[in-house]
């Protein structure tokens, strides 16, 4: 008789634990509709992550931009110092006409 009582207690344990999380969660668990719960949790995670990124960018955005943006005559990311970028093959003679796509 004690075995049947402990078996019933073990079967009721998940319902008791899930009931502590909330009655709605318990109803969904009992209905075996965990897809809805998983979707809600993933959606909540996505929203919280995006809010965290937005908040962090608000605090540290200028610092990050300052690390990667170096104004000057170099390349777009400022990696070439003092305008030493020189590509003579890209230059054209002053008297040479501009070429169009059809040529």
Curated annotation (Swiss-Prot):
**According to the UniProt topology, which residue ranges lie Cytoplasmic?**
27-40
Query: Primary place of residence?
Result: membrane
For the Extracellular compartment, the record's topological domain ranges are: 2-8, 62-103
Regions of compositional bias (Polar residues) in chain numbering: 78-87
User: Glycans attached where?
Assistant: 77
**A family per Pfam:** T_cell_tran_alt
Q: Where does it live in the cell?
A: Membrane
Q: Where is this region: Disordered?
A: 71-103
Which residue ranges does UniProt annotate as crossing the membrane?
9-26, 41-61
Q: Which GO terms describe its biological process?
A: negative regulation of osteoclast differentiation; osteoclast fusion
What Gene Ontology terms describe where this protein resides (cellular component)? membrane
Q: Which UniProt keywords apply?
A: Acetylation, Chromosomal rearrangement, Glycoprotein, Membrane, Proto-oncogene, Transmembrane, Transmembrane helix
Instruction: Establish whether keyword Repeat is in the entry.
Output: no
Residues with PTM N-acetylalanine: 2
In which tissues does this protein get expressed? Ubiquitous. Highest level of expression in kidney. Present in monocytes, osteoclasts, macrophages, synoviocytes and synovial lining cells (at protein level).
Membrane disposition: Multi-pass membrane protein
Q: Which InterPro entries match?
A: TCTA (IPR016560)
| Heme listed as a keyword | no
The job of this chain, per UniProt, is described as: May be required for cellular fusion during osteoclastogenesis.
The disorder on record is: A chromosomal aberration involving TCTA is associated with T-cell acute lymphoblastic leukemia (T-ALL). Translocation t(1;3)(p34;p21).
Similarity-based family: Belongs to the TCTA family.
Q: What is this protein called?
A: T-cell leukemia translocation-altered gene protein
Q: Which organism is it from?
A: Homo sapiens
Q: What is the lineage of its organism?
A: Eukaryota, Metazoa, Chordata, Craniata, Vertebrata
């Amino acid at each position: 008789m004690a075995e049947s009582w402990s078996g019933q207690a073990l079967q009721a344990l998940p319902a008791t634990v899930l009931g502590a999380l909330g009655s709605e969660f318990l109803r969904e668990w009992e209905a075996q509709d965990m897809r809805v719960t998983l979707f809600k949790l993933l959606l909540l995670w996505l929203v919280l992550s995006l809010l965290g990124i937005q908040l962090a960018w608000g605090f540290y955005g200028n610092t990050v931009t300052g690390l990667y943006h170096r104004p000057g005559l170099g390349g777009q990311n400022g990696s070439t110092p003092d305008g030493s970028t020189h590509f003579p093959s890209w230059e054209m003679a002053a008297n040479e006409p501009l070429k169009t796509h059809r040529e």
